[in-house]
Amino acid sequence: MIEQSLDNLILASSSERRVALLKQINIKPGLVLPADIDESPLKKELPKDYSIRMAKSKAEKIQSANPNYFVLGVDTVVACGRRILLKAENVEQAEKCVRLLSGRRHRVYTSVCLLIPDQSKQHIRTVVTIVKFKRLSEQEIKYYLASEEWKNRAGGCNIQGLAGMFVLFLRGSYSSVIGLPLHETNCLLSNYFNLY
């Protein structure tokens, strides 16, 4: 298959996983630019709303400097109930997240925002996936934390790596949990690009 190079598409992300996921469906953005935004949740902000706001903010930040481009902003949020689990900045935070998720269901919200040049239009899709982890032993928790796979991961979890062995079930989109819902992203982009 030939990879589609979409020269006038910017992926507003620093995530190599998202670039790899786009490549999986033969899409190569013209540019990949990280958006430096404040990612602090608002008081009492719900996980889905936070995910949408972050995806939109990332896209808007990049498009403000590149108004003639389509911009794809994406954000993935792990939530236990209404509690948003941010990226762990240290091993203590990662341990809190892993212990909280142990033996429980949690939701992963991934929002995709596509901005059209000059912000004449915006499209937002959010995919919710339910994931259940097995009850983790102390040994498993220590082993996972020592791996440092939790670094720069929403909720401190990398199901492509070691945390994959903790998943009892996943209901929804696997690619969304990794960082980009492929079906929804393909549908959004195919409205504006000839992908086939």
UniProtKB/Swiss-Prot annotation:
Keywords: Cytoplasm, Hydrolase, Nucleotide metabolism
Protein name in the entry: dTTP/UTP pyrophosphatase
Required co-factors: a divalent metal cation
Its job: Nucleoside triphosphate pyrophosphatase that hydrolyzes dTTP and UTP. May have a dual role in cell division arrest and in preventing the incorporation of modified nucleotides into cellular nucleic acids.
Keyword Hydrolase: yes
GO molecular function: dTTP diphosphatase activity; UTP diphosphatase activity
Protein's UniProt keywords contain Transcription: no
Sequence similarity: Belongs to the Maf family. YhdE subfamily.
HAMAP family per the UniProt record, alphabetical: Maf
Localization: Cytoplasm
Catalytic activity: dTTP + H2O = dTMP + diphosphate + H(+); UTP + H2O = UMP + diphosphate + H(+)
Active-site residues, record numbering mapped to chain: D75 (proton acceptor)
Site (Important for substrate specificity): R17, T76, Q160
Single Gene Ontology BP annotation: nucleotide metabolic process
A cellular component term, taken from the record's GO annotations: cytoplasm
Source organism of the structure: Wolbachia pipientis subsp. Culex pipiens (strain wPip)
